[in-house]
Amino acid sequence: MKFFVDSANIEEIRELQNLSLVDGVTTNPSLILNSGRNILEVTKEICSLVKGPVSAEVAATEFEDMMKEAAVLAKVADNICIKLPLTLDGLKACKALTAEGLKTNLTLCFSANQALLAAKAGATFVSPFIGRLDDCGINGSELLHEIRTIYDNYNFETQILAASIRTVSHVKEAALSGADVATVPPAILKALITHPLTDKGLQIFLNDWKKTGQNIA
């Protein structure tokens, strides 16, 4: 499973990129707002840091305007992935942009039916929001399983990009469900590394090593 960083913070992305933990990046209007920067400026900088897909989202809700904004975003860099809402106009734009050879990410997916339509529209990625489903008392990981089954049944090439990840458990659920990608906030990605027993075991080893009186280098 690939890891995308869900952030528009350059320093956070650079830190994780230096650890070789980044396969791509996803942004959205909320993350752009938090960055305090111009969308084209910050997206271009992210694309220069990361070789993988960088999702940049249109703000338009109607087809013609989506296409205009997508044309602007596509000029930022070759690794731009146009992010579109999973609506009728979004599906229409996805189909058109895919025909132009552009990567697309249909976002705000909350049902297997929506994911099926995303695949039919030729989306590169579909982004099921598992955290927001959990907020509503619906098992988000179950949706990932459903989408995986449907896609495997029909050999769809659209990749499942698990989004709205709030906890390390969400990451594990995404991996177990067969998601192709998990887009993860930097703090959650770092939290995957830690475990209290790892820290405890390391301290025991260090204490015992000191008792040997040895040096390796």
Swiss-Prot record:
NCBIfam families in UniProt: fsa_talC_mipB
The record's catalysed reaction(s) read:
D-sedoheptulose 7-phosphate + D-glyceraldehyde 3-phosphate = D-erythrose 4-phosphate + beta-D-fructose 6-phosphate
One Pfam family from the record: TAL_FSA
What name does this protein carry?
Probable transaldolase
Q: In which pathway does it act?
A: Carbohydrate degradation; pentose phosphate pathway; D-glyceraldehyde 3-phosphate and beta-D-fructose 6-phosphate from D-ribose 5-phosphate and D-xylulose 5-phosphate (non-oxidative stage): step 2/3
- Please describe what this protein does: Transaldolase is important for the balance of metabolites in the pentose-phosphate pathway.
Which species is the source of this protein? Bartonella tribocorum (strain CIP 105476 / IBS 506)
- Its EC top class is transferase
Key words of the record: Cytoplasm, Pentose shunt, Schiff base, Transferase
| GO terms under cellular component | cytoplasm
Q: Which family does it belong to?
A: Belongs to the transaldolase family. Type 3B subfamily.
Keyword Transferase part of the UniProt annotation: yes
GO molecular function terms noted in the UniProt entry:
aldehyde-lyase activity; transaldolase activity
